[in-house]
C-alpha cells in the first residue's frame, strides 16, 4: 500500500510540474478606426497547441474634442486553433463571441483573427495579434488592428 501511495504521489507531482499551465495575457495596440485598445486575459492550454482565452478589454476612440467620450469595454471567450508550430513559436487562428458596451449602449459581437506567439526560455511569450471585431446592436460595427503583448505563466 505504501508503494502504491508513493507512486500515486510522484505521478501527481510530475503532472502538476508540467510547463503547460495557464498564462496571464496582457496586450495593447491600435485598431481601426482610430482606436486604442488594452486587453487582459487568462489563457488555458488544450491539447496539440490549441487554447481557450477568457479576456476583458477596454478601448477608446480618440476624437478631436472629446477624448474620453468614445470609450468602450467588452469581454469574451476565444478559442485558439493552432495552424502552424515552429521551434519556439506558434501561429493560431482565434475565434469567439464577445459582449460589452460602448458609450452606454450594449452590444454583442464576434471576434476573429490570427495570433503569432514566440516562447522565451523562461516560459514567457511574446504575442503579435491581428484582431477583427464585428459588433451588433450599435454604431461601432467594425474594428480591426494589431496588438502586441506578453503572456506570463503561472
Where are the model-predicted features located?
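Structural signature of outer-membrane beta-barrel channels/translocons
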Residues: 43-47, 80-84, 100-102, 115-119, ...
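Cleavable N-terminal export/targeting peptides
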Residues: 1-23, 154
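Solvent-exposed loop/turn segments connecting transmembrane beta-strands
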Residues: 26-39, 62-71, 99-108, 134-143
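Transmembrane beta-barrel strands of outer-membrane/channel proteins
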Residues: 26-32, 54-60, 77, 93-99, ...
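Short loop/turn motifs that connect adjacent beta-strands in outer-membrane beta-barrel proteins
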Residues: 19-22, 47-49, 83-91, 104, ...
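Short glycine/proline- and aromatic-enriched beta-strand/turn motifs that initiate or cap beta-hairpins
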Residues: 19-64, 151-153
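Membrane-embedded beta-strand positions in outer-membrane beta-barrel channels/transporters
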Residues: 25, 37-39, 74-78, 111-113, ...
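Outer-membrane beta-barrel "beta-signal"
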Residues: 141-154
